[in-house]
Amino acid sequence: MSLATEEQIGESSYVPNVDGITKISKSSFMGYLMCPRQFWWNHLADVPRPPPTEAMIRGGKVHKVMEVGLLEGADAVDRAVAEEGVDPLDPAIESMTSLLHQIAYDLGGFDIIEVEKKHQIFEKLNVAEIGKVDVIWVGMIDAVLRHPDGGLILTELKTGNMGVGKLGRTRRELCFYKMILDKMGIYEPITHFLYICPDYQLVVDREDKLLLEGSKRGKSLWLGDHNGIAILEPVGSRSLNAFEKRLNDTLPNLFSHKWDMNWNDYFCMTWCDFNSACQQELHAEELGF
């Protein structure tokens, strides 16, 4: 296991190939978990990629603003907002600034190890039912901070609203990043995950289960003035074990080129650019073709 060379990176592809070098990023892994068929459309089908949505563009800009806030302090956020062309009235900016102030105060400031640094690790991996394959693990973590009690904090910014389901998926993403840093072996142990969610809106008409996270052992929770939530939690062995099992169960399917459809009436119709093709297939199956 080693840092991937420029030659290895140039020869790699997101197309799973037992005879070549397969690139596996957090996004591609989570994408395959979400829907293997959508993964096929994104990485194997010879079709034009859809342009980024307004939400994706906004999310990228908000990430950049947070990067400046971490590196230069929350007082630098206004300048970053202007430079990135973010709407200064975007409520996420106010809530993120408030959250960063609160977190920095409680942690005694931000001791930053890295921000938005891309890692690419080459490994000869033994995959069940497949054998040895060459893999490049790819990860770019929003931020790695040092915890005041020792150990490191993996930090993830999530735009869009946040709930317990999305929190669980984000936890899996951070487990993926932890795996990469552990393989590198260059840092001290990773002990905490931090989720910063500036778009979160408090549920007022029913119990908000996300708020219960703050009462769990070892966890801390911060709320913005109007919107936004941040949660700091210890890395749990249960989450790591579940991630490892999911990874080991998924890789044989990925390298066996299994492109099953995980149809969901809401998700597919709302978020997938390729839903019409799947709808046609489902309709044909209903008709017995």
Regions found by a protein language model. Give the residues of each.
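Short amphipathic alpha-helical segments and their helix-coil junctions
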Residues: S13-I21, P36-R49, L154, K245-K258
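Long, acidic, intrinsically disordered low-complexity segments
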Residues: M1-I24
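Nuclease catalytic cores
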Residues: T22, K26-A74, I93, E116, ...
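Metal-dependent nuclease catalytic regions and adjoining charged, substrate-binding loops involved
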Residues: I24, K124, V164-L167, D182-F289
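A short beta-strand motif that forms part of the nucleic acid-binding face
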Residues: A45, L157-N161, C197
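Active-site metal-coordination segments of metallo-dependent hydrolases
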Residues: P52-M56, G163-R171
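Catalytic cores of nuclease domains that cleave nucleic-acid phosphodiester backbones
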Residues: S2-E6, V68-M162, K183-I190, L202-V203
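An active-site-proximal "capping" alpha-helix that borders the catalytic cofactor pocket
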Residues: T170-K183
